[in-house]
Amino acid sequence: MEVILLERIAKLGQMGETVKVRDGFARNYLLPLGKALRANAANKARFESERATLEARNLERKSEAQQVADKLDGKSFIIVRSAGETGQLYGSVAARDIVDVLAAEGFNINRNQVNLNQPIKAIGVHKVTLHLHAEVDVAVEVNVARSAEEAERQAKGESLTSAEAIYGVDEDALKPEDFFNPEAEFAGEEE
């Protein structure tokens, strides 16, 4: 099916382009969300008459998204979760958790704008990309920790999942002799 794009869509085209897409993609996504029109003579004429309005609206949305991106750029957000001593979370941090933290800070971001390929399942500082507009992306840091104190330590660059952090032992200084005695007699069954 051929459609006329009403806004820029990643990996598909710019506003005003006529592109050929699969019928299901057009019927289930592009047309219901108002991102495209069927490419027929009447809709082409309608698009050309409304083109200036659509471009102005798109420019306004882009400038609003850019203002939010400027406020978010370089910010770090702390999420406190319970985790095991190795740093594995009991559960995970998903896009909705990040949206909740951003909302608490006064940013109105939708869950589908958070670009998180898979949930965060370990403590640490993670980079998360927010897709605010078709042409505006911003990266923020999400600091997942067991407590606010640990979040501060992680922000300074300290690792909380190393053997030193967990057991108070420098893992580079460990030798095999620390764990077993090489001169010990074999206590198992002999052949």
Swiss-Prot record:
Record-linked PROSITE patterns: RIBOSOMAL_L9 (PS00651)
Record-linked InterPro entries: Ribosomal_bL9, Ribosomal_bL9/RNase_H1_N, Ribosomal_bL9_bac/chp, Ribosomal_bL9_C, Ribosomal_bL9_C_sf, Ribosomal_bL9_N, Ribosomal_bL9_N_sf
A molecular function (GO) term: structural constituent of ribosome
SUPFAM superfamilies: L9 N-domain-like, Ribosomal protein L9 C-domain
A Gene Ontology BP annotation from the UniProt entry: translation
Cellular component terms per the entry's GO annotation: ribonucleoprotein complex; ribosome
Pfam families per UniProt: Ribosomal_L9_C, Ribosomal_L9_N
Domain of life: Bacteria
Keywords: Ribonucleoprotein, Ribosomal protein, RNA-binding, rRNA-binding
Function (record text): Binds to the 23S rRNA.
PANTHER family named among the record's database cross-references: 50S RIBOSOMAL PROTEIN L9
Record-stated family: Belongs to the bacterial ribosomal protein bL9 family.
Name of the molecule in the record: Large ribosomal subunit protein bL9
Organism: Sinorhizobium fredii (strain NBRC 101917 / NGR234)
Organismal lineage: Bacteria, Pseudomonadati, Pseudomonadota, Alphaproteobacteria, Hyphomicrobiales
Chain's gene name: rplI
